[in-house]
């Protein structure tokens, strides 16, 4: 099982609809991708060895770092603690993946301490060249940041969810989710390699697009969008993310009424379903919010509650 990271980029909308005045950025994985090919997902990926090198770790600001590391330390005592190498690796990988896939760089300028802006044509061109070199493996992410006098501030990413691939799957990831505000003066543009399309949508718009068959979503992405759809602004989302306790969620896959179902740890049928469980979690699960299962009905996933058979988006 490989450690991985996912980043939900946020930006305010220009709409007058105050019920959901923010958007999230979704990228479409290339069809040839071995994992979630053709799906619309949030930017992210697995940790690379280079994300945990000394040169990469030195680029992480110590200001606020210890508190950030403690926050992402799992409360599940049956799993290894999140040490400095993994914590900083997650931060580096998060920023690297967002830059590679979306062209947004969540970094600060060393000489000023200000959030990076790339709206100047010369700067934008230079950073596109760096992005191309990274894609070709001609330089490391640490080399790039060092050359541009940039550093990573943990405050720019807020941890809010932890999903682990079910034990029955061959390709498994231990993924931590973060939310981040897209810096002013930067623009999200996909790389046309790992990602072939990118869209900004409010959570409700993204779910609607899925229901209409315009985009494909995996169950974790659908659940995250549903969780976010109850918020009204970027600041509201970040405050919610910073204030919630995060415990690992490792679903089980079973069959309910002849339908494939992904059962979350607080589902009444979870314990009776075959599959690995995380030991040491309190019951009920501390993150027992919303639906308890995601059911494949026809060609689409629907979030359901065992006690009330109605979908979240009905």
What is each of the regions a protein language model found here?
Residues 1-314:
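N-terminal leader/linker segments that precede catalytic domains of diphosphate-processing enzymes
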């Amino acid at each position: 099982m490989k450690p991985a990271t996912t980043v939900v980029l946020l930006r305010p909308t220009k709409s007058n609809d105050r019920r959901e005045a923010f958007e999230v950025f979704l990228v479409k994985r290339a069809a040839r991708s071995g994992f979630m090919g053709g799906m619309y997902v949030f930017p992210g990926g697995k940790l690379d060895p280079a994300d945990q090198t000394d040169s990469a770790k030195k680029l992480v600001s110590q200001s606020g770092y210890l508190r950030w590391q403690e926050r992402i330390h799992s409360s599940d005592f049956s799993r290894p603690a999140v040490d400095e190498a993994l914590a900083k690796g997650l931060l580096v990988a998060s920023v690297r993946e967002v830059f590679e896939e979306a062209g947004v760089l969540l970094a600060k300028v060393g000489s000023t301490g200000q959030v990076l802006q790339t709206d100047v044509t010369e700067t934008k061109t230079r950073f596109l060249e760096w992005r191309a070199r990274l894609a070709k493996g001609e330089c490391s992410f640490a080399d790039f940041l060092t050359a541009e006098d940039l550093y990573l501030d943990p405050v720019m990413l807020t941890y809010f969810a932890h999903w682990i691939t079910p034990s029955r799957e061959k390709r498994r990831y231990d993924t931590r989710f973060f939310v981040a505000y897209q810096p002013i003066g930067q623009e999200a543009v996909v790389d046309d390699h790992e990602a072939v399309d990118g869209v900004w949508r409010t959570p409700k718009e993204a779910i609607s697009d899925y229901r209409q068959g315009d985009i494909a979503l995996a169950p974790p992405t659908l659940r995250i969008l549903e969780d976010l759809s109850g918020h009204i602004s970027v600041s509201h989302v970040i405050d919610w993310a910073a204030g919630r306790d995060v415990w690992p969620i490792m679903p089980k896959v079973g069959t309910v009424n002849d339908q494939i179902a992904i059962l979350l740890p607080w589902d009444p049928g979870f314990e009776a379903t075959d599959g690995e469980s995380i030991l040491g979690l309190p019951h009920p699960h501390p993150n027992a919010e919303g639906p308890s299962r995601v059911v494949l009905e026809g060609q689409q996933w629907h979030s359901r509650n065992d006690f009330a058979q109605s979908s979240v988006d009905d």
